[in-house]
Amino acid sequence: MKFVDEAFIDVAAGDGGNGCVSFRHEKYKEFGGPNGGDGGRGGHVFAVADPSLNTLVDYRYSRRHEAKRGEHGMGSDMFGAAGDDITLKMPVGTIISDADTGEVLFELLKPGETITIAKGGDGGFGNMRFKSAINRAPRQKTPGWPGERRNLKLELKVLADVGLLGMPNAGKSTFIAAVSNARPKIADYPFTTLHPNLGVVRVGPEQSFVVADIPGLIEGASEGAGLGHQFLRHLQRTRLLLHVVDLAPFDESVDPVAQATAIVGELRKYDAELYEKPRWLVLNKLDMVPGDERAARVKDFVKRFRWKGPVFEISALTREGCEPLIQAIYQHVRAQQQAEQVQEVVDPRFADDAASD
């Protein structure tokens, strides 16, 4: 599934340090020759493509990034130290453009690729630079040059790691709103979700995964019924499918097992490879089930559904059971990322563009 994630940042490279006016102090000589050193270079701002990242979510919480300025020159021919550089980790596929003009400045297309997005200013000259046969005791110096400052727009075509499957009103939108920054429309009637919603689930610093809420499927979706047929193809590039089931439907005549079986049938009809993709069962709306009935209802569902895979019991509304599920998803996604070998193929984010060339 392809979405566009974006963030705006301000970067400032370090200013160069100022040059120094200084003279040697020797015995019987009040002023020796000039020995004022140059200022140090300001720190650069680099960006590096990190294959372990898949969103720009961290840059929404930290917009300003500044490198250190260079130190000033000193006497005894001592140059100022260069300012510390900073390196910003960004996902592979990030497009960096000028926020004011829209001009594309850089693209990070390969893992480990490093670019300079703001250059530090050069250090100023000390007075030793101005010594000449005519001027043996120069008092001139120059200030450091300012570092580059830029307002940048970061743009990333995001691939969803996790896709949510389920019948309309199974609670997928409530789940994605509970665990991520997405705010889909939520209501008590089917087909609330009319378009895919993307949510970034933050597990920790530089630890996140992307989850996509697909419009609810109905029986016959693989042949074009309902709203879900046009979105089934987007699930093919996800790393994990979560099959969300409403375990407590308002209509008591509705059989959750029959609904879940219909969803699995649509997957099998649409694409055998998609059907074989890792899939976990998420039994939702347990807050609507009396506590003394939960275990029996879950056991009955799993038995009738003939399910052998992982099962998670949650209430997206109260967030009960959501945290263990989030941690398990992250571990699964991370393991798959590490197992995938870097191959020289067209990045899926740009597959459409490459096909049209």
Swiss-Prot record:
The OBG-type G domain is annotated at 160-334
Q: Which InterPro entries match?
A: G_OBG (IPR031167), GTP-bd (IPR006073), GTP-bd_Obg/CgtA (IPR014100), GTP1-OBG_CS (IPR006074), GTP1_OBG_dom (IPR006169), GTP1_OBG_dom_sf (IPR036726), OBG_GTPase (IPR045086), P-loop_NTPase (IPR027417)
Q: Its Gene Ontology biological processes?
A: ribosome biogenesis
Q: Cellular component terms, GO, for this chain's entry?
A: cytoplasm
Question: What are the EC numbers?
Answer: 3.6.5.-
* Superkingdom of source: Bacteria
Q: Which enzyme class, named as a word? A: hydrolase
According to the record's subunit comment, the protein's assembly and interactions are: Monomer.
| PANTHER family, per database record | DEVELOPMENTALLY REGULATED GTP-BINDING PROTEIN-RELATED, MITOCHONDRIAL RIBOSOME-ASSOCIATED GTPASE 2
What is its biological role? An essential GTPase which binds GTP, GDP and possibly (p)ppGpp with moderate affinity, with high nucleotide exchange rates and a fairly low GTP hydrolysis rate. Plays a role in control of the cell cycle, stress response, ribosome biogenesis and in those bacteria that undergo differentiation, in morphogenesis control.
Put simply, this protein is called: GTPase Obg
